[in-house]
């Protein structure tokens, strides 16, 4: 690829990430929209990945890989497709049904992102990382400005900035320190001064943010540097590459397992063991392991954790945190096991092993300066650590997949080979671009349709407007508002909307409750059993579930259901008082 073309690729990718990091839906345009950050990130990612795919198709001679890398990508795609088809919620699993939109389509887009970044040599990649740091520092500055009420962004208050959440903010800034070090190692004195100021800015922003994970990231960064400086005193056996790769991969698994056990160890883990946020996560993780144990091979479906959470949450979780409903496991390891099962997890693990192997080969062959390589490895480690304890935004995932793609590309990308363009080589990336653009278009259309209607409803709660819901929008975040709009057209339209939602997402609890309540209010006992039993299956501990199910059990004489409900109520500490619904 010519120098000019590579420069254009660097500039485009850099600007694309800046857009992904800072773009959002301003409150002035759609003030009543629920989430003004994640939808924009998804659309931006899909469009950028589609353009990457077109570039890959046009420059296919640059994207030739060893078979092991091809097998890894193919395994990931295949496992995602199988989990997608087996989920029972095709569109929800494709786009994502947690409100953060991390379904299969985002995985495909991130894989394309990784492939695109595999083409870069060291010097262009340094320039690219500069763009990425500019974007992250823009987010940091925006967060600080918001903290002092100079500007205001949608989402949480304080320093959440364009990410909408202080945890997301802290995670992104905390993982940035190794990238700043990477640039400092490859910059002039003036550049190092600027980068030092950027690091200080991030520390100050983390101080304002408050989440403990940001300080832990900084601590891991300092410990990592100390290990590198003291490496000559650390025994390093001359083991074979395969053994070191296996040990590195196993170490990642053990580290993820240790983090999983942390909330259960309590006082054995100083500071963190009894942290409130850590304790809450233990309940999320137990729900995830129960989902996994019931769907071992392919999981409950990509990004379907939230739709299965109420069925699998523990009694302790229900009693302690009755009003907390989690749409995410808050752990990449638990979320992956629960949603894509053993097969999908092994596919991701294979790619992690490939990244580790690439780092080792580059280290041995000195393809890249070892200090710079260590900084990138430290970034990967700190990112993975964050992902094991917290949700990660799509813009944050973008950087991780970009770095991993670059590393793997240094080892497993074959030299370019001039040849005639064959449609067979262009077909797959062009098909990828078409799918990504199609999903982006349909998702954007669904968002705009929802936002425009919800604004009219917010202005006048009695307005009667025809609204056509889209399966692209999650039940968890959107259905309640959709139901309010539909109710203005009458109960029949609201019931029709609920049935449409359940046809696409059989685990939409709000829709199931509405249909069950409607049947109860109408005294439709014959058809009530199926509705009640389904509701009891997907949300057994909800007050609405217990009340409606008890009504049916008493009216129909269903002794078995009544006994199950009484046991459930006793466990939850509830007292049954006969009334209108029982």
Protein language model annotation of sequence segments:
Residues 2-28, 42-56, 73-85, 103-235, ...:
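Alpha-helical transmembrane segments of multi-pass inner-membrane proteins
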Residues 25-38, 57-63:
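Short, hydrophobic transmembrane alpha-helix segments
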Residues 27-36, 88-98, 148-163, 318-327:
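Membrane-interface interhelical loops and short amphipathic "cap" helices
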Residues 92-97, 207-212, 387-394:
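Membrane-interface helix caps and helix-loop-helix hairpins in membrane proteins
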Residues 158-159, 221-222, 242, 255-293, ...:
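Flexible juxtamembrane loops connecting transmembrane helices in multi-pass membrane enzymes
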Residues 165, 282-326, 333, 340-347:
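TM-adjacent membrane-interface loops and short helices in multi-pass inner/ER membrane proteins
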Residues 244-261, 420-447:
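Internal/C-terminal transmembrane anchor helices
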Residues 457-582:
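C-terminal luminal/periplasmic domains and tails of membrane-associated envelope-modifying transferases
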């Amino acid at each position: 690829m010519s120098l000019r073309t590579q420069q254009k690729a660097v500039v485009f990718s850099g600007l694309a990430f800046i857009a992904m990091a800072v773009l959002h839906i301003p409150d002035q345009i759609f003030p009543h929209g629920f989430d003004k950050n994640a939808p924009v990130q998804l659309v931006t990612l899909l469009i950028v990945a589609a353009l990457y795919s077109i570039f890959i198709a046009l420059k296919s001679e640059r994207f030739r890989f060893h078979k092991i890398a091809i097998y890894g990508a193919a395994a990931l795609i295949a496992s995602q497709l199988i989990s997608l088809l087996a989920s029972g919620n095709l569109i929800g699993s494709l786009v994502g049904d947690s409100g953060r939109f991390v379904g299969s389509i985002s995985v495909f887009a991130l894989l394309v992102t990784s492939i695109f970044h595999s083409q870069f040599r060291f010097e262009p990649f340094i320039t690219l990382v500069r763009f990425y740091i500019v974007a992250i520092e823009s987010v940091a500055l925006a967060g600080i400005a918001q903290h002092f009420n100079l500007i205001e962004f949608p989402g949480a208050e304080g320093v959440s900035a364009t990410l909408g959440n202080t945890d997301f903010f802290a995670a992104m800034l905390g993982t940035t320190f190794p990238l700043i070090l990477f640039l400092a190692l490859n910059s002039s004195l003036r550049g190092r001064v600027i980068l030092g100021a950027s690091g200080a800015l991030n520390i100050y922003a983390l101080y304002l943010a408050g989440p403990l994970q940001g300080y832990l990231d900084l601590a891991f960064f300092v410990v990592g540097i100390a290990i590198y400086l003291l490496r000559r005193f650390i025994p390093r056996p001359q083991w074979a590459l395969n053994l070191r790769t296996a040990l590195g991969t196993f170490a990642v698994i053990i580290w993820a397992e240790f983090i999983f056990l942390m909330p259960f160890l309590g006082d054995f883990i100083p500071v963190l063991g009894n942290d409130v946020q850590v304790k809450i996560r233990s309940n999320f993780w137990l729900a995830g392991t129960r989902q996994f144990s019931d769907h071992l091979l392919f999981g409950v479906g990509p990004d379907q954790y939230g739709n299965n959470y109420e069925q699998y949450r523990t009694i302790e979780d229900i009693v302690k945190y009755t009003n907390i409903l989690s749409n995410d496991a808050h752990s990449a390891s638990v979320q992956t096991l629960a949603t894509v099962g053993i097969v999908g997890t092994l596919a991701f693990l294979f790619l992690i092993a490939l990244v580790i192997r690439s780092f080792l080969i580059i280290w041995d062959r000195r393809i890249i300066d070892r200090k710079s390589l260590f900084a990138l490895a430290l970034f990967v480690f700190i990112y993975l650590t964050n992902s094991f304890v917290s949700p990660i935004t799509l813009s944050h995932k973008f950087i991780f997949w970009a770095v991993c793609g670059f590393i793997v590309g240094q080892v497993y990308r074959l030299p370019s080979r001039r040849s005639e363009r064959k449609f067979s080589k262009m077909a797959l990336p062009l098909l990828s671009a078409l799918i990504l653009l199609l999903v982006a278009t349909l998702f954007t259309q669904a968002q705009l349709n929802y936002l425009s209607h919800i604004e009219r409803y917010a202005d006048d709660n009695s307005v009667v407007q025809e609204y056509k819901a889209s399966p692209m929008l999650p039940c968890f975040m959107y259905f309640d508002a959709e139901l309010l709009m539909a109710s203005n057209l009458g109960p029949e339209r609201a019931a029709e909307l609920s049935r449409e939602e359940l046809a696409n997402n059989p685990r939409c609890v709000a829709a199931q409750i509405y249909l069950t309540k409607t049947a109860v209010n109408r005294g439709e006992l014959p058809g009530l059993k199926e509705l009640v039993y389904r509701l009891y299956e997907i949300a057994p501990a909800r007050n609405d579930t217990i009340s409606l199910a008890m009504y049916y059990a008493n009216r129909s004489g269903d002794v078995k259901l009544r006994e199950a409900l009484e046991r459930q109520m006793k466990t939850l500490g509830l007292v049954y008082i006969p009334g209108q619904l029982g």
